[in-house]
Amino acid sequence: MHTSIFAPLFAFCLTCSAADAAETKSTGDTFPHVIETFEVGENVNVRALTVETGKNTLWVGTSVGVHEIDIATRKVINTFTRDSGLANEYVFAVGVDKNGYKWFGTNAGGASRYRDGKWKTYFPMHGLADYWVYSFANQRNGDMWIGTWAGVNRVDLRSMKFTTYVKELINEWVYGIAVDKQDRVWFGTEGGVSMFDGKTWRSWSHKEGLGATNQGKLAASPNTGLGTRSRHDLSMLSGDGKLTYNPSYVFALQITPDQSVWAATWGGGVSRFDGTRWQNYTTREGLAGDIVYSIAQESNGVLWFGTNNGISRYDGKSWHNYDKKAGLLEDNVYALAVAPNGDIWAGSRRGVTRIGR
């Protein structure tokens, strides 16, 4: 049974639970299940999900603009497009800084900043490393980091000074950023992972164990579609139509309470770094798909992974997977976020799925 309620540019579709259809290697307690879906359009992609905890709202970055959703009521609060002040409607990243400004990373439009109805967009002329912006992260000292296709920016939010780092990184194409308890900053790039502790840099790639070996016999690809400025479709296919593989290509990072670093790789599954070595998890261990786009973490440490074949929930011991049969809008899940009430929000083509108990 499906019930649809339409709002401007954002349709709400209530979906029946289908948890029993999920593939699982777990037993025991009842798992979270798909509760409802929000559709944004047949050919629209949801690429970014960010929870603003102070307001209990969810920011949804899509290929046609940004929506602000009230988490409690699931109602649309705001919809922003180019006419509203957004630099470009194709949004790959959403961040919230210490001053409550919302930052939107766009495809070829720079970074737009918003608060209280006022907009400002930053371009390379202002110090931004590139027009293509893929990630934001905040340090405890208040600085914001911005990942682009031409390095990273460290932004002093008091002076709005932009400092750019390129050569220090293992690769200049930066997709994911995470900050650990020591305020060290980790960067996921198309060539591996780099870490900056404030003074020195370190880097790791597949040579050091990042990403599993090519178990699926996928086509080798140093460039999967995101690493070329002529295509922005998150293509998983090589020229001959085969799934591609690049274990050093890291699209997202997550730091867990034990300070392990989890890296989402392109074809090499998900990798966990304990400070000494990398341990890889693939479909052989229970991961839904070996191309991993996104990672989110619950307050209890449970991890969620968005892949090319659905979502995986991992509690440190066992896996539980979700796909279209379980109620997801699509199997390719590009973005994940955890709401204050523990619900999981998943972004894909066509819209967003909410998972909860």
Locations of regions flagged by a protein language model:
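Bacterial N-terminal signal peptides that target proteins for export
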Residues: 1-7
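Bacterial N-terminal signal peptides
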Residues: 7-15
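Intrinsically disordered, low-complexity segments
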Residues: 2, 15, 245-246
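Carboxylate-rich, polar loop motifs that coordinate divalent cations or form catalytic acidic clusters
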Residues: 19-357
